[in-house]
From Swiss-Prot:
Its EC number is 7.1.1.-. NCBIfam families: nuoB_fam, PRK06411.1. The gene is nuoB. It comes from Blochmanniella floridana. NDH-1 shuttles electrons from NADH, via FMN and iron-sulfur (Fe-S) centers, to quinones in the respiratory chain. The immediate electron acceptor for the enzyme in this species is believed to be ubiquinone. Couples the redox reaction to proton translocation (for every two electrons transferred, four hydrogen ions are translocated across the cytoplasmic membrane), and thus conserves the redox energy in a proton gradient. It catalyses: a quinone + NADH + 5 H(+)(in) = a quinol + NAD(+) + 4 H(+)(out). This is NADH-quinone oxidoreductase subunit B. One of its GO terms (molecular function) is 4 iron, 4 sulfur cluster binding.
């Protein structure tokens, strides 16, 4: 029997399609419009807020999982956690009907072309959440068959640490994604506004809550 080994895209031409995380802070594009035309600038600001409000409160996840972190993700959809409070309870079985994809589990090398194809089938705007240590950095699988991080072949918006993360961590990631979407600036159409995507420069929650972690001296049982 003949076997075919499918490798990840490593050519230089493919790097432009799925670049690694390369973000740089830029100024809000609405500031220039407000200076040129105060009325039109305020109108665009209201339109962006209305569109972002609708997108952030109706996030449909793609029903996709790779490993044990997927079990923790589906636990968040039970009545105990009630993820429907955030408008993200509608699991979609097709990437064309979903808003974001959660890479929950170990990204094996053979799965990379499949994940990339599913990501390409998603309609804009779309987002990616990396859930678990294996998806973030390969975890404990530092071997030839596991990609050391999803951001090697997909743009990632939110990282969830843990092995595996708790369902509460997934809910916190949804809240962070909602916060990021509310700060985004996307073109309203192909003739109006700049044809570029401006995203929020999010800082690590570990650094933001560093003082709170250091000041904690007593720990209680999570249960």
């Amino acid at each position: 029997m003949k076997y075919t080994l499918t490798l990840a895209r490593t050519n230089q031409d493919d790097d432009s399609v799925y670049p690694e995380q390369d973000q740089k802070p830029v100024a809000d594009p609405l500031d220039k419009q407000i200076e040129k035309n105060v009325y039109f600038g305020k109108l665009k600001n209201l339109l962006h807020k209305a569109v972002n409000w609708g997108r952030s409160n109706s996030l449909w996840p793609y029903n996709f999982g790779l490993s044990c972190c997927y079990v923790e993700m589906t636990t968040a959809f039970t009545a105990v956690h009630d993820v429907a409070r955030f408008g993200s309870e509608v699991l979609r079985s097709s990437p064309r009907q979903s808003d974001f994809m959660v890479i929950a589990g170990t990204p094996f090398l053979k799965m990379v072309p499949i994940i990339q194809r599913l990501y390409d089938q998603m309609l804009e705007p779309k987002w990616v959440i990396s859930m678990g240590s294996c998806a973030n950095s390969g975890g404990m699988y530092d071997i030839y068959s596991v990609v050391q991080g999803v951001d090697k072949f997909l743009p990632v918006d939110i990282y969830i640490p843990g092995c595996p993360p708790r369902p509460e961590a997934y809910i916190q990631a949804l809240l962070l994604l909602k916060k990021s979407i509310n700060k985004e600036r996307r073109p309203l159409s192909w003739v109006i506004d700049d044809q570029g995507v401006y995203k929020m420069n999010m800082k690590s929650e570990r650094e933001l809550k560093r003082k709170d972690r250091i000041s904690a001296v007593e720990f209680s049982d999570t249960d």
